[in-house]
Amino acid sequence: MMQTPYTTSTQGQYCHSCGMFHHHSQSCCYNNNNNSNAGSYSMVFSMQNGGVFEQNGEDYHHSSSLVDCTLSLGTPSTRLCEEDEKRRRSTSSGASSCISNFWDLIHTKNNNSKTAPYNNVPSFSANKPSRGCSGGGGGGGGGGGGDSLLARRCANCDTTSTPLWRNGPRGPKSLCNACGIRFKKEERRTTAATGNTVVGAAPVQTDQYGHHNSGYNNYHAATNNNNNNGTPWAHHHSTQRVPCNYPANEIRFMDDYGSGVANNVESDGAHGGVPFLSWRLNVADRASLVHDFTR
């Protein structure tokens, strides 16, 4: 027994073939399957609140929720559904590609933010100011690498090119090589001349034993005079002061005449025959034992 494709109710009928509910005023698309030239059809949409929405009109192929009871048949509506399916797939793939591109962009931003501090670090291979290109001229390393406006100049000859800068009266590296050598030689010559002047101005060392020699000579002169006059004396007293360290100090003792006669001791004939005994504590009158300071 063949089952009826419809279930009729008071509001309409339910089609078992398409699974849709139709009103009495409209017929199911199952009845129009054999009529391929039908220009209009009826579509029923299921709403989220459980109600039924029906739309009549020409071919509609923009809604993604379109449900047609002739999907299993080779009608133009089937081709439209296939196109809608392709369109949905392309839309979903486009959305997924957009999402993936969005996440890639976020990931790239995060990577850039992490590596940004290292990119701001200055490189050590940056251009460095060249040395010896402006200040030294053709002099090489001694010219000094600086700005041409601040080029080093010699304090004497005002040159800016020299193989070596030398110290001068204005401070270190204030003279060129030639002027520095001349300045150094002049400085040494001045120092040597100053030293010679100081040595020449020193007083000439005199004989520190001059007063001793004069006293020694005066002493012998007085002694000879006394001996020539024949005056006997017991202890010699010189009017001239003789230093305590003078080696010619001597003390003579004269014995009485009786002892002198008893001992038969006579002095030299030059003394007038006056006998006396001479005791000398140190023999300073002997030239072999006394140093002559006059030599």
From Swiss-Prot:
Changing G180S: In han-2; reduced fertility. Abnormal flower and shoot apical meristem (SAM) development with fused sepals and reduced organ numbers in all four whorls as well as flatter and smaller meristems. Signal peptide: none annotated. InterPro entries: Znf_GATA (IPR000679), Znf_NHR/GATA (IPR013088). PROSITE patterns: GATA_ZN_FINGER_1, GATA_ZN_FINGER_2. Disruption phenotype: Abnormal flower and shoot apical meristem (SAM) development with fused sepals and reduced organ numbers in all four whorls as well as flatter and smaller meristems. Reduced levels of gibberellins (GA) but increased content of trans-zeatin riboside (ZR) and auxin (IAA). Coordinated apical shift of gene expression patterns in the basal proembryo, including auxin transporter genes and resulting in apical redistribution of auxin. Altered WUS expression from early embryogenesis (e.g. globular stage). Expressed in vegetative and inflorescence shoot apical meristems (SAMs), axillary (SAMs), floral meristems, developing ovules and stamens, vascular tissues, and in the embryo. CDD domains: ZnF_GATA. Keywords: Developmental protein, DNA-binding, Metal-binding, Nucleus, Transcription, Transcription regulation, Zinc, Zinc-finger. It is found in: Nucleus. One of its GO terms (biological process) is regulation of meristem structural organization. One of its GO terms (cellular component) is nucleus. A zinc finger (GATA-type) spans 148-202. It holds the Pfam family GATA. Homodimer. Forms heterodimers with GATA19, GATA22 and GATA21. Interacts with JAG. Binds to AGO10/PNH. 'Hanaba taranu' means 'fewer floral leaves' in Japanese. Transcriptional factor that specifically binds 5'-GATA-3' or 5'-GAT-3' motifs within gene promoters (including its own promoter and GATA21 promoter), thus regulating the expression of genes mostly involved in hormone responses and floral organ specification (including genes regulating hormones responses). Regulates both flower and shoot apical meristem (SAM) development, especially for establishing organ boundaries in shoots and flowers, probably by controlling the number and position of WUS-expressing cells. Coregulates, with AGO10/PNH, the shoot apical meristem (SAM) organization. Belongs to the type IV zinc-finger family. Class B subfamily. This is GATA transcription factor 18.
